[in-house]
Amino acid sequence: MNLALEIVSIEGNIYFFIRTEERFKNLVETQMYSQYPTAEITEVEDYTKYVPKFEPGGAWECRAFEMKLDKEDAIPIKTYIDFGMDSKSLSLDEEQKIDPMTPLIEMMSSLKAGEQLWMQIFVRGAGKSLKLNETSGVVTFFKHLFGEKEDYLHLSDDKGGSQDWQAQGRKYIDKLLDEHSSTIIGEGEKAKKVGGYKNLPPDKKDLVDRVERSIMKFGFDVGIRVVYYAKKENFNGGRCPSEVTSAMRQFAAPKSASYNSLAMNADTFTNGLDFPWQDWNNMRAYKAQKKMFELYVKRAYYYPPATSKKD
């Protein structure tokens, strides 16, 4: 089951959309109503149809980029617990609670006439590495394809879809513990270090606890894409990426090793060239802008026409 959760600002008016397959419509609505009983859900036309397609030299300007995690996948960003939104924090006064969406919504609501900002968050269940019985015909096929290597059991689509994310988390914890282990028990091949956790500094202990809590939950492959689309006379270059990335900083704690952060993937930024001679007549920028616009409209991220990218 794949979903596209979309937050859209059309001239400062904020809308929330969920893009899914028809067969999952009732499931999505049921889950929404169970959490938000007073919510109003309406099936609507695709809002991207109400603006002209991006064309170089046209009346509209486009900037777009995708986001990535700044650190290893195993390190989580801030979650509802950190914002005092879990059951243990229900006793907090309203003024003590933090709504993590506020900076983003405030920024998006500041858009003027002729400006639109679209953000789509792709979600699908996180898969694991391929684990099949050695007698399986599929394994035999992969052996024929890749040879007698262990790699054929760890295929990855570079979007994280077939990685064992829980094993990655445990491996990361083991790495931290090993770095702070001091006592060796046993000899030879049976020797191992112990005492790692108690030797960890406070921020590293907090990090281990957060990673452990993260891998105990359901995992999801997530991708974030942002498009800023505006008429040329209304275009504000400061909106994207600066204002968007600034509005996402509340999910990180820059001075703490316990948190990951969301950052712009510079390889996907449509206007990422620094000097005029790198892009004669803006041909490369126009091509990138048109591609990102089309990928957004098609909701393509995990599969073609999107291409797999590292990070």
PLM segments and residue spans:
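Extended, folded cores of ATP/NTP-driven motor/assembly subunits in large transport
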Residues: 1-311
